[in-house]
Amino acid sequence: MRNQAITVSAMSLVAIVALAPASAAADQASGTIKLQSKAGPIIVNVANVYMVKGPDAASGKTIRQLIFASADLSAKLQACASMSCASGIVSDGMTVDFDAGPRLNYWVVGNGQKVQYSGTARPDETLKLTADTADRLAGSLAIDDGAMGGATANVKFDAAIAKQFSK
């Protein structure tokens, strides 16, 4: 009887662990993102990157998105139930959408989202990937829209999927 109780308890523990949501842990990234504001330049020293997957807001098509930040956003990302929430947790950093079309869509924010810039970039000119799978993106990204009053970004990253959304 005691062995049965231990077996059932062990099976229950395995089931609980299997059903628990995976942690949306940060992967390491490095580099800088710069954005011009009226008060002067905003510089974000990137330390963390997260890869999320889910439906694009415009098309509904499943896309991959990289979220670059200096702060650890793991807890906030874990609490998100949608892709729009995941994008919205960035207060100083950048999101980059993959698979939404022939260009990369990106959004850069600084000073607690008070300063924003969005644009598109040609992957063949700005992106060098060393890994490109459904569950992992690695490489470097160099965007320079500074001459147009926009953002510049020069980051290296290696990101495994942190979270997948259905909405």
Residue ranges and their predicted role:
Residues 9-20:
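Bacterial N-terminal signal peptides
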Residues 131-167:
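C-terminal or internal capping secondary-structure element at the end of a domain, subdomain, or sheet
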